[in-house]
């Protein structure tokens, strides 16, 4: 990520999360300062053109997950979006945010950005990557089933969630649903699913497993 990308990233954020305040230049600069190699940008250039534009981003930081609780919110895990809790000794890569411009969705960019983050896990010999998956399909059925029942149905394929199903197809595993992960997510009825991808070369020992 470069400072010249900041305006495009803020624009993508405004389009992907219209109810949220876009990232500021100061916040993006802080991310880049704390963990530069963990801020991944995907660019797109039309055929025959050298004028590439930002098409998607994946923001990550390293955490010592034993210092946190699995029910912690996005604000807690990102230190209110400052990434000041990035820990070079951390064994977990936390996927704080992944966004793809609506102009480039369904082109495989989210998968490519996830693969780039997994490469960071492998290259730095981290134990795993952890994230919080929105459950935008849950709000419509929350009155008749619990979040646990909904996530179980999505895992077995009997129900489809626009976000969690895509994560499962991309190799993530569900740990469990949690409440209050994001401040403003009415489509998910305030719920999210903790998901993880374990490094097959150095998986976490039993005392570091998430439950």
Q: Model segments located where?
A:
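Short amphipathic alpha-helices and their capping/turn segments at secondary-structure boundaries
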Residues: 44-46, 81-85, 114-126
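A short beta-loop-alpha structural element at the N-terminal edge
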Residues: 1-9
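Active-site rim helix/loop that mediates acceptor-substrate recognition in acyltransferases
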Residues: 16-67, 72, 78-84
